[in-house]
Amino acid sequence: MIHRKTQAQWFGFSVLYFFLFLAGLHSAQAAAGSPTKVVLTVGAVSEREGVLYVALDQGFFRKHGVDLTLVQVRSGPIGIAALSSGESQLNWGSVSAANLGAIAEGADLVFVASFINKLTGNVVSNPRIRNPPELKGKSIGINSLGGGAWIFTMLTLDYWGLVPERDKIQFRALGDQSVIAQGVLGGTVDAAFLGYTYGKILESKGFRILADVEKLPIPYQGSGLLAQRGFAASSPGTIENVLRALLDSLAFIHNPANKPQVMKSLAKGLRLKRVEDAGDGYQIMLGLYEKKIYPNVDGIGNVIRLLGQSNEKIRRLKAAELVDDSVVRKLEKEGRL
């Protein structure tokens, strides 16, 4: 079980230090007088975030007039807190308990684009676990309660007919993907939902891949951009330029001549010791992203259904009302998608 007091204290300190960092960042920006500053938070570290790493390394944001600061946060709730308070303008993430819970409590947030409209990754376990039913009574590593890895895991368990409370499946909040992978490797937890890069690394060490969840028919709204509804309405040009940069990044990723640079960016983003360890992640990235980056209303609705079973406020949310795809529609009319 997660030690709630320790987790709450860590979350409080993380939020405090994060906001102090952003306050200093905004002060420096004001002094410099630079245009179109954007702070984008991200709580995950996997090949799903590769499009961000490449866009930064190749200067695509600056090409489109955006000075973007990518801030890695420990968990989704910290990123949502920053977005809700206006300390950041965008959050990269998937539909989760963190953002749906915040919206249910009054945060006016919307998905403005989605680059991955499916569950992706591996459920990895120690070799003694041979199939999903044997997860009963075991521990699973996650980044945080309510975060992306948690909801990925919950949706997969739901598909398998497993209920954590009934089946005595425990969650342990460990941190980002690299820490979770170490937790499985070292026996701290019995299993975890991991991105393909870390999943392949553990498989090479004898651990079992219980599922490649991309092959399971689970509707989902995956990695995309969230903004405050007011920001989406008042600054559509900024969102448009961020999306143009990310579309340039996708085109760069899919050009075979750029493989060495893409792998280098991915290895750096995933904190891999060797660039060659990003090879599997690179191959996955080639088939990972959507051609049309519309938010997935059905996928959002599926998570509302799951979480709404135990949260009345979330159950009352309407998926279609959590989307503002006006900028994406404009880009499609221009032929960019």
Can you say where each PLM-predicted feature lies in the sequence?
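N-terminal secretory signal peptides that target proteins for export/translocation
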Residues: 1-9
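Short, glycine-/small- and polar/acidic-enriched structural segments
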Residues: 31-186, 190-196, 209-213, 218-219
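Pocket-lining segment of extracytoplasmic ligand-binding domains
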Residues: 97, 178-270
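Secondary-structure end/capping motifs
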Residues: 233-315
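Sec/Tat signal peptide C-region and signal peptidase I cleavage site
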Residues: 25-30
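Bacterial N-terminal signal peptides
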Residues: 12-24
